[in-house]
């Protein structure tokens, strides 16, 4: 009976440790994805707006070097 109890407790600890490790991996992946999304959501300038190095033109628009305006 003692051997069965020890085996049961050992199995419980292994399952708990595995669950905790998976939880930390999920948190790390979520944090990585959040940082990636933050970089991808930089502000951009639409057509007719001023474009700078800090606020480039939105996708599909070009920044004219004369006047620094976004255009098609």
From Swiss-Prot:
Propeptide span(s): 18-41
InterPro entries cross-referenced by the UniProt entry: Conotoxin
Keyword terms, alphabetized: Disulfide bond, Knottin, Secreted, Signal, Toxin
Intracellular or extracellular location(s): Secreted
Tissue: Expressed by the venom duct.
Disulphide linkage map: 44-58, 51-63, 57-70
Signal peptide (from-to): 1-17
One Pfam family in the UniProt entry: Conotoxin
Record comment regarding domains: The presence of a 'disulfide through disulfide knot' structurally defines this protein as a knottin. The cysteine framework is VI/VII (C-C-CC-C-C).
Protein family per UniProt: Belongs to the conotoxin O1 superfamily.
Name of this chain's protein: Conotoxin LvVIA
Originating species: Conus lividus (Livid cone)
Higher taxonomy: Eukaryota, Metazoa, Spiralia, Lophotrochozoa, Mollusca
């Amino acid at each position: 009976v003692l051997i069965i109890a020890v085996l049961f407790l050992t199995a419980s600890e292994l399952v708990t440790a595995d669950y905790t490790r998976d939880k930390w991996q999920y948190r790390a992946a979520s944090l990585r994805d959040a940082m990636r999304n933050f970089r991808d959501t930089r502000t951009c300038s639409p057509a007719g707006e001023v474009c700078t190095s800090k606020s480039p033109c939105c996708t599909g628009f070009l920044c004219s070097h004369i006047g620094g305006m976004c255009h098609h």
